[in-house]
């Protein structure tokens, strides 16, 4: 799969487990992101990254977003992908995806066909 296609399945946008402001986190530019994928109870993929590897810090993203736009409260940034499974990898119905971010929590979703 071409990477943008792998991130934007039809009818899908997992966000969570909670919304936080960057000011509520000690250092939003140094958070560990971990991804684990389980199939039939077995770990089949695991990787981690950090927000420190982002091309722009959150303050810079906010500055550019608000430069020419009115931005309502609870606006959410959807940024790039720091964790990339191998090209031959694909999620299957029933797979369990866990994504954890330091100071935020763990989002856990099971893959379903819609």
Say what each PLM segment does.
Residues 1-114:
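Catalytic-pocket segment enriched in acidic/His residues
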